[in-house]
């Protein structure tokens, strides 16, 4: 038998065995994951959620967490490739993507319609889309950047609250609306001027919407992060993330833990679920006590 054929006859079965071994390993990992999740109390089982800004950062972590807890999620974002890839990675039976510019009310209304037509209802809105302008002196405040920040962070949230609440009221759904605010909604100093103004305004909107929607059984709350490394706060390469996390930890009150996007998603999950059934109008601050014990110093 020629030497080349002998080598082929030896290697091919080994490659086939390697492939079979990998397939077995991968099947086992999926079985183990499903077994773990089946033992988890799924606090959003059967719920339908919209997550804005859901393609990356806090939003993407929330998409993963909400679907792990039984929800079907519509990822709303302008980052189409990231959003589509995230939906595919989770499974299109659990997550789907809808491209939407939150500053365009028609886009917002259509995103809610898409969700209701696809799933029959809407239970949860996590309004998380936001922008952060560069730090600078108020003496040099860029009013065009100010308008853009307010348009995304406040007007966009207002449009989604409006249309999500309309859907919930029409279907008699006792829903939950959660908005990503910031510790900059509680104090001045930690954030850029336009961002701080927008988050103060958003917190006012949350409290006002809470008053208006309570009669329908709809809860409205905010979740307020301390500094967390996401694509909005850094270029999101390893070096930038590490630097931002080290900076946040050095300034933070709670030592020994680094705030991650996952921690904010977990707070949003609590507010979205019936575990917080009698909580409304609140701003759940996830800052390790930073905002109540000291102010940021320069």
Curated annotation (Swiss-Prot):
Enzyme Commission code(s) on record: 1.1.1.-
Sequence positions that bind substrate: 182
Residues reported to bind NAD(+): 50-74
Gene Ontology molecular function: copper ion binding; oxidoreductase activity
InterPro entries referenced in this protein's UniProt entry, alphabetically: NAD(P)-bd_dom_sf, SDR_fam
EC main group: oxidoreductase
Record protein name field: Short-chain dehydrogenase reductase 4
Species of provenance: Arabidopsis thaliana (Mouse-ear cress)
């Amino acid at each position: 038998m020629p030497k080349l054929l002998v080598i082929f006859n030896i290697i091919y079965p080994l490659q086939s065995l390697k492939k079979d071994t990998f397939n077995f390993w991968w099947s086992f990992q999926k079985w183990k994951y499903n077994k773990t999740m089946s033992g988890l109390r799924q606090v959003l089982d059967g719920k339908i959620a919209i997550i804005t800004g859901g393609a990356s950062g806090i939003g993407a972590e929330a998409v993963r967490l909400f679907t792990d807890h039984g929800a079907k999620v519509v990822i709303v974002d302008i980052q189409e490739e990231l959003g589509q890839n995230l939906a595919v990675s989770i499974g299109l039976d659990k997550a789907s993507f809808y491209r939407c510019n939150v500053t365009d009310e028609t886009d917002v209304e259509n995103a809610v319609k898409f969700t209701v037509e696809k799933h029959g209802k809407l239970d949860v809105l996590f309004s998380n889309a936001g922008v952060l302008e560069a730090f600078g002196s108020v003496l040099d405040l860029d009013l065009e950047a100010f308008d853009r920040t307010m348009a995304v962070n406040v007007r966009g949230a207002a449009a989604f609250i409006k249309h999500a609440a309309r859907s919930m009221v029409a279907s008699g759904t006792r829903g939950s609306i959660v908005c990503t605010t910031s510790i900059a909604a509680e104090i001045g100093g930690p954030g850029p001027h336009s961002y701080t103004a927008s988050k103060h305004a958003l917190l006012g909107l949350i409290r006002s919407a809470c008053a208006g929607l309570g009669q329908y059984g709809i809860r409205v709350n905010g979740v307020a992060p301390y500094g967390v490394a996401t694509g909005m706060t850094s270029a999101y390469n390893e070096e930038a993330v590490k630097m931002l996390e080290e900076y946040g930890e050095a300034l933070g009150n709670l030592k020994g833990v680094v705030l991650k996007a996952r921690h904010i998603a977990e707070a949003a999950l609590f507010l979205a679920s019936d575990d917080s059934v009698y909580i409304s109008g609140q701003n759940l601050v996830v800052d390790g006590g930073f905002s109540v014990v000291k102010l940021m110093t320069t």
